[in-house]
From Swiss-Prot:
It is a multi-pass membrane protein. It comes from Bacillus subtilis (strain 168). It is found in: Cell membrane. Belongs to the monovalent cation:proton antiporter 1 (CPA1) transporter (TC 2.A.36) family. Nhak (TC 2.A.36.3.2) subfamily. InterPro entries: Cation/H_exchanger_CPA1, Cation/H_exchanger_CPA1_bac, Cation/H_exchanger_TM. This is Sodium, potassium, lithium and rubidium/H(+) antiporter. Induction: Constitutively expressed, with higher levels at stationary phase.
Amino acid sequence: MDIFLVVLVLLTIIAISNIVNRFIPFIPVPLIQVALGILAASFPQGLHFELNTELFFVLFIAPLLFNDGKRTPRAELWNLRAPILLLALGLVFATVIVGGYTIHWMIPAIPLAAAFGLAAILSPTDVVAVSALSGRVKMPKGILRLLEGEGLMNDASGLVAFKFAIAAAVTGAFSLAQAAVSFVFISLGGLLCGVVISFLIIRFRLFLRRLGMQDVTMHMLIQILTPFVIYLAAEEIGVSGILAVVAGGITHAVEQDRLESTMIKLQIVSSSTWNIILFILNGLVFVILGTQIPDVISVIFNDTAISNMKVIGYILVITFTLMLLRFLWVLFFWNGKWFFNKDQNIYKPGLRSTLLISISGVRGAVTLAGSFSIPYFLEDGTPFPERNLILFLAAGVILCTLVIATVVLPILTEKEEEDEERNKKLLTARRKLIKTALQTIKEDMNETNKTASLAVIAEYNEKMKNLRFQQYTSSNRIKKHERKVRAQGVKAEQEALMKMLERGDIPEETANVLQERFNELEILYANPFKVGLSKTRLKRLMYWIFFGEHKKPEMSILNEAGLIRATRVKTAKAAIEYLEKHKTDEHKEVFLSVITFYKQLIFRLEHSHHELKSSAHFENQKLEVKLKAVQAIRNEIQTLFEEREISRDISHELRQYINDVEAAMLEGGE
C-alpha cells in the first residue's frame, strides 16, 4: 500500500509540474519537477525512499533510450557520426582523466580512482533534459541532432568508465589493457545484442501477423515489453544494456514502416500509448531525482568537519571545469576541420554555437543513479572514502548545469522567429496534419463507412485547397488551374465515351446525351462567366440521370437512366486514370481534389438507387471518421514537435485549434 501511495504522489507531482509550467513557461518542466521533488522530500513525513539503481535503469532509462533511438533521424546521425563519437567517446575519456585529476587535486580526501569514478559518472549528458530545454529555445538543427546522438552514446561509455574506476577504487587493482578489451567487448556486444534481439522480436511479430493474429492490443504489449527484454538480456550476457536498447530502437525504426504501414490502428495506438508512457517516465525520472537530493545534501550540510561554502565552491569549480573542457574539445576538433571527416556538408558550428554545445551538456538522471551505485564498503571492509561527499558533488553538478542551461541558453539562442517565418511554418504544419488525416481516413475506409469517409475526405481536401490558396498572391490563380484540371478530366471522359461508342458498348443515343453534357461542362470550365447557367444545366442533368424527365414508360426511363449512370461511371474512372498519370508535384493538391470529386461522383452514381439508412446514421458515421482523424492529427503534432519541425508555441496553437474543432464536431457544428 505504501508503494502504491508513493506512486500516486509522484504522478500527482508530474501533473502539478505541467500545470505550473503553464504559468511560468520560461522555466523548463524538468527543473520544476526536480524542485517539486525536493519539496516533497524536504518534510519529515515526505517522500523518502532509497533509490534502487538497477531497477531505475531498467524501468526508466531502457524505455526512454529505446524510444530516442527509434525516433532520432538515422541519416542525420550517420552524417554526424564523427563529431558524435568524438563527444560520446573522446570527450568522455578526456573528462575522466582531466576531471579526475582536478577533483583529486582539489579534494585530496577523495582517492584518485574514486575521483576518476566521479568524473566518469559526470561525463554523460541527459538527452531528456536537453530535449526539454531545446523545446523552449530556437537551437540550430545540427546542434540538436549532435546533442541527441551524443546522449544516446555517452551514457554507455560513461557508465563503463565509471564501473572500472569504482572497481579499481574498491579492489585497488587496475589494468589498462584489460579495461580497454572489456570496453570494446561490452560496447560492441551491446550493439550486436540489441540488433539481434530486435530482429528476432520483429520476425516474431511478422510471424504472428502471418497467422492472422493482428490484434492491436497484443502487438502494442510486445512493443512495450521490447526495451525491457533487450536491456535485461544484454545485462545478463554481460554487455551494455544501454547500447543494446539504443541499437534496438534504431533497428525497430528501420523496420517500422514495413511492419506497420498496413496497420494504421497500431500506428495510432502505438503513438498515443508511447506518448503517455514517455510523458510519465520523463516526469518520474526528474521527480525521483529531486526526492533524492535533500537526503544527500543534509548529510554534508550537517557534517561539521566540512565547510558548506567550500563544498559549494567545489561544485562550481567542477561544473566550470566540465564546461570549459567541453568548450575547448568542440572548438579544437571542429575548427580543426575534422580529421575524421572533412565533408563540407557536415554541420560545423561557429564560436557561438560551440558555446551553445558546451552549455547544453546538462547532467541528469544517469549521473545521480550511477553515483548511488557506489558501494558502501571497500574490499577490505572499510567504508568507501567520502561516498557522501561524492553523492553531494554529483547532485550539485546536476542542479548547477540544469540552472545554468535554463538561464543562459535563451540568451545565446536566436529570438523567436518573425511573424512571416512563423506563419510559413504554421501553414506547412497544417498541410502535414491534413495529409495525416487523409491517410488515416483512407486506411480505415471500408464498405460500411465509405460514404461518410468520402464526405470527410472531400472536406479535408477543401481545407488543403484553402491552405494552398494562402501560398499564392492571388486565389484566382489556383482556381484557374483547378478549372484547367477539371477541363482535362472532361476531355478524358469524352475520349473514353467515343471509344465505348466505337466498340459498340453503348447506344448512340446514350453517347449523345452525355456528349452534350460534357460540352456544357467544357464551356463552364473554359468560361467562368457562364457559371450560373452551367450550374443550372448541371443540376437538371443530375436530376434527369437519377429521376428522369421524359414522358416514357417507367421501365424505359429507369433503364435509360441506369445505362447513362453506368456509362458515366466508366468515363469518370477514365478521367481518374488520366489525372493520376498527369498530376504534377507543384499542383498535387489540385489534382487530388479533382480526383476525389470523381471518386465521390462514381460512388453516388453506383449507389444512387439506394437510400442512406438514415441521415442520423450517416452523420454518426461521419463523426466517428472525423474523431479518428483528429486523434491521428494530435499524434502527428506531437511527432512534429519531438522532431523539432515546429516550436512549442506553434504546437500549442495547433493543439488548441484541434480541441476547438473536436468540440465543434461533438456539438454538431463541424
